[in-house]
Amino acid sequence: MGSADERRFEVLRAIVADFVATQEPIGSKSLVERHNLGVSSATVRNDMAVLEAEGYITQPHTSSGRVPTEKGYREFVDQLEDVKPLSSAERRAIQSFLESGVDLDDVLRRAVRLLAQLTRQVAVVQYPTLSTSTVRHLEVIALTPARLLMVVITDSGRVDQRIVELGDVIDDHQLAQLREILGQALEGKKLSAASVAVADLASQLGGAGGLGDAVGRAATVLLESLVEHTEERLLLGGTANLTRNAADFGGSLRSILEALEEQVVVLRLLAAQQEAGKVTVRIGHETASEQMVGTSMVSTAYGTAHTVYGGMGVVGPTRMDYPGTIASVAAVALYIGDVLGAR
């Protein structure tokens, strides 16, 4: 990037920063007054003319100032060198708040609420997906000699409990055998593979009488549980923040709210997040959704060093504090992964 290009990018960066802060179109005089650009107002005007001709900024009809375009925001984000770091106190507060969650649901609810507060945007967190979750442990408990409680725990912290009604009573020795058979079939397997293994058990041993009948009944109930988890789930928080920024969306606020409620677009964008620690910024039309025009989405994946559990991020207007939002999304994702991975 040549010196003139570098100077124009500094002008663009100043326009983005001021417009995000003030929501008012930016003129050359205010840029010279607020920023140490080292050039005259006339030079800044010339640079703004070039930026406008190249599509990075535009002039609203009602103002003599300029505002960034989607292309301008994209250039600004692509040229970001330093993402605003969170303070050590902020990081400790995030970690402590998430660690206080009692289970997977509570941790994710806390995460979505926290992210909405940090960014003042709509926060979205995808529940751990079926394809990536692994069965960590299966426990089988006899409530009565003919009634069992099965508890499935995944590596992401998901806990599912099911009751199994047996046709015949089983003794403690048979209960231990049942626990071993089911544990060997499930533990350490991805949920998708576990459902296949359980289906095989049900077909091989179901109806064989005695222990075989108990295995078949338990496997059938487990299969129902595993199949139910195929549905993608999304947590939303801070939707009221959209109305606070209603002016940024023109007349499209209703369609944005509908897209968030339907979840399909957001889940599609989050599904593309395959690498924990890498933050993706989609601006305006980059979301590839007419319903989401006028919005930006900052997202990443969360999980452990070896497993991605799901995606998370924020949705807000293109007039967004990108450095601060990127830092917040990255930090919350990191601590969600740490908290869930330690359980």
Swiss-Prot record:
The gene is hrcA. Belongs to the HrcA family. Signal peptide: none annotated. GO terms for molecular function: DNA binding. InterPro entries: GAF-like_dom_sf (IPR029016), HrcA (IPR002571), HrcA_C (IPR021153), WH-like_DNA-bd_sf (IPR036388), WH_DNA-bd_sf (IPR036390), WHTH_transcript_rep_HrcA_IDD (IPR023120). Negative regulator of class I heat shock genes (grpE-dnaK-dnaJ and groELS operons). Prevents heat-shock induction of these operons. GO terms for biological process: negative regulation of DNA-templated transcription. PANTHER family: HEAT-INDUCIBLE TRANSCRIPTION REPRESSOR HRCA. Disulfide bonds: none annotated. Keywords: Repressor, Stress response, Transcription, Transcription regulation. This is Heat-inducible transcription repressor HrcA.
